[in-house]
């Protein structure tokens, strides 16, 4: 029996939008969160409008989960595409309560909801909206308004959720309040999401896959961690370059306030509030927080030293080296970045293929994806 092909989102949008040329083609899994990332004005929002059918570029194509939304003979109008759309600014009906706003997006036709339909009570719980239902949108904070807008989009029972810079109008504190709610949605719902942002911290927290854009074109497509660690791409050579791992909690040491995490190719000890064994957390490790040693350090204040192999190197400027490491004694684990001075590189006599220990000075641990904020 032939194995089932995993569902995908396939899109190719080409054409002129005023004075802007869009030439963006990509295929991504129709699962999880796909980040659409690049500098302002690179065409991210234009791609989202094309996916929604709000922009019609002849000769383009779009297929979601095996359903053709656009090709040479087909073009589904926006209201015929099963999408939810969350904009930068939450557009709520001021004369309706929060509950009425949420229900406004729900399908009124019997049988319209699909097998993965999300229930009203589930949306309320996931987004923490129970105490807001009777209130007017006029009395909501910016973060609360955006959570209501997300809930309304979910209750329209979409097969694809489009999010166009949903946090860009919010201050950093409010963003930090909303991100855990988005992580809960990611953990609990099977709905595929295309998430547009020019803020790499949002992408690092949320995305599983990444479409990297520049000047109307797609530079690269793939799993987030692969693109983060590719020295040919701008993410890896940026001064704030980092990689992410999805880690499983192995144990918690209450005496020292440390959680032991299993990642692909090693283990980490990270300061944390109490967590339960078996939880999954996303961790971020900056290249600037990684140093290398030829031998396992015997006395060091750095808690984490993981065996690794140098697999790729690339000069950065005249006096630095970008090093891509594969974790594990055989170099079969996840990829990690380190940024070294050329002097350190020469003193340690490093080269591709050399086995080292990666000393990790700092690890950023995201809130849980298990439904707890």
UniProtKB/Swiss-Prot annotation:
Family matches, as InterPro entries: AAA+_ATPase, ABC_transporter-like_ATP-bd, ABC_transporter-like_CS, Mo/tungstate-bd_C_term_dom, ModC_ABC_ATP-bd, Molybdenum_import_ModC, Mop_domain, P-loop_NTPase
Membrane topology: Peripheral membrane protein
SUPFAM superfamilies named in the record: MOP-like, P-loop containing nucleoside triphosphate hydrolases
GO MF annotations in UniProt: ABC-type molybdate transporter activity; ATP binding; ATP hydrolysis activity
Reactions that this protein is recorded to catalyse: molybdate(out) + ATP + H2O = molybdate(in) + ADP + phosphate + H(+)
Family of this protein: Belongs to the ABC transporter superfamily. Molybdate importer (TC 3.A.1.8) family.
Name used for this protein in its record: Molybdenum import ATP-binding protein ModC
Lineage summary: Bacteria, Pseudomonadati, Pseudomonadota, Alphaproteobacteria, Hyphomicrobiales
Name of encoding gene: modC
């Amino acid at each position: 029996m032939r194995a089932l092909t995993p569902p995908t989102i396939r899109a190719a949008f080409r054409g002129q939008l005023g004075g802007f040329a869009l030439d963006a083609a990509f295929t991504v899994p129709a699962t999880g969160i796909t980040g659409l990332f690049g500098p302002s004005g690179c065409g991210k929002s234009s791609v989202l409008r094309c996916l929604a059918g709000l922009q019609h570029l002849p000769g383009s194509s779009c297929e979601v989960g095996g359903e053709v939304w656009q090709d040479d003979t087909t073009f589904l109008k926006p209201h015929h595409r099963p999408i939810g759309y969350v904009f930068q600014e939450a557009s709520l009906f001021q004369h309706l309560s929060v509950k009425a706003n949420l229900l406004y997006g729900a399908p009124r036709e019997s049988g319209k909801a699909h097998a993965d339909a999300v229930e009203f009570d589930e949306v309320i719980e996931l987004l923490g909206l129970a105490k807001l239902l009777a209130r007017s949108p006029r009395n909501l904070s910016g973060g609360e308004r955006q959570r209501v807008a997300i809930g309304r989009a979910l209750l329209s029972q979409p097969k694809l959720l489009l999010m166009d810079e949903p946090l860009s109008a919010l201050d950093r504190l409010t963003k930090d309040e909303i991100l855990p709610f988005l992580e809960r949605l990611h953990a609990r719902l099977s709905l595929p999401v295309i998430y547009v942002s020019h803020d790499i911290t949002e992408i690092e927290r949320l995305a599983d896959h990444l479409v990297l854009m520049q000047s109307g074109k797609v530079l690269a497509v793939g799993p987030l961690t692969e693109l983060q660690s590719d020295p040919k791409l701008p993410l890896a050579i940026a001064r704030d370059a980092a990689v992410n791992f999805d880690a499983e909690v192995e144990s918690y040491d209450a005496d020292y306030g440390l959680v032991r995490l299993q990642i692909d190719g090693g283990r980490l000890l990270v300061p944390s509030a109490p967590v339960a064994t078996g939880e999954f957390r996303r961790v971020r490790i900056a290249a600037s927080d990684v140093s290398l040693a030829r031998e396992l350090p015997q006395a060091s204040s750095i808690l984490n030293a993981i065996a690794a192999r140098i697999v790729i190197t690339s000069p950065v400027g005249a006096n630095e080296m970008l090093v891509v490491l594969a974790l594990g004694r055989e170099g079969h684990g996840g990829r990690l970045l380190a940024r070294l001075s050329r002097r350190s590189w020469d003193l340690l006599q490093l080269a591709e293929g050399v086995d080292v220990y990666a000393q990790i000075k700092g690890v950023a641990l995201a809130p849980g994806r298990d439904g707890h904020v």
